[in-house]
Amino acid sequence: MQIVITGGAGFLGARLARTLPTPQNSYGIQKFIGEQLVADYARKGFIRGRNVRLMTVSVRPGKPNGAASSFLSGMIREPLAGLRAACPVPPDTAVALSSPARTIEGLIRAAEASDAEWGARTAINLPALKTTVGEMAAALERAAGKEVASLIDWTPDAAIANIVTSWPAVIDAARARALGLLPDRDFDSIIAAYLGENPRTKPPVTTQ
């Protein structure tokens, strides 16, 4: 029986993903425990287990939720719908992102890869686009204009900022690249894809 488990890079801590795990919150600890259980069950032959470490997915459709990363979709999704959105971290905050399409592509590849392609380690980091929250806001302005981008409220929240900055912004995804997986080109392309997949979202035309 094969099981593909989704996890995250949050348990790695703020250092590069090639370092030993240093989770800085309960979420990271729980993800790390889950990975080890899958690895142990695979070692014993109970399952054919694969841990896929997802990057923060943006832009997600739907409504805001209670996750610390929720604003990384909300600060784009809500303004495009004409709604205000809070951004609780400074513009220079670095983040590692992946579009929904790239994330799904990675999960499918993980499920279909042969044992020889996958290798002995059960866990793999999916590729990430490294960007900053400020660059995300700038991409929104390029896509939809200043009026839409002005719907972002820069409202600092130290608790959220402490969590987000404990996540790695630089990810070692060499194994994923060997499987043919690549990160998104830039955040402009992520917004363009979101608009294409959500035709009800119609931002004003911008000449900028």
Q: Where are the language model's segments positioned?
A:
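Alpha-helical substrate-binding/gating segment
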Residues: 72-86, 94-123
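Conserved beta-loop-beta element that borders a ligand/cofactor-binding pocket
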Residues: 35-61
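Amphipathic terminal alpha-helices
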Residues: 2, 156, 168-178, 185-208
